[in-house]
Amino acid sequence: EQARLLLRKARQDSVIVSRAVGDLEIADEIVGFHVQQACEKCMKAVLCARGNSYRRTHDLQELHDLLHDAGVALPDALRELVVWSPFAVAYRYEDWSATPPVDRVRAESLVRAAIAWTEGELPAEDTG
């Protein structure tokens, strides 16, 4: 099922974020990109599991709005997800130097919370 695939992919992004916490050779832009990607996939997984469609987008605010319209509220701990949208495209191709450094520990915590939230929103996996 697509929702489970998206969750698995979010977990893959989470591995990169976790490994980057202590590895300053990994650029902040890369860390931010994988935070954004994990959060995007989590939000899309929940939408997909509920039968809601979404267009191809990296805009976390748009996905947040779709979740809201579908009656799904992000937990307070995840409200800041939307600020990671620029990492999907803009910060991959623009000068990063004018932007504050990424709080990697906070980023890892946010991704873990997003994955835990998604796991709770998806129906139980059929182990048949």
Where are these regions (language model features)?
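Terminal alpha-helical segments
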Residues: E1-G128
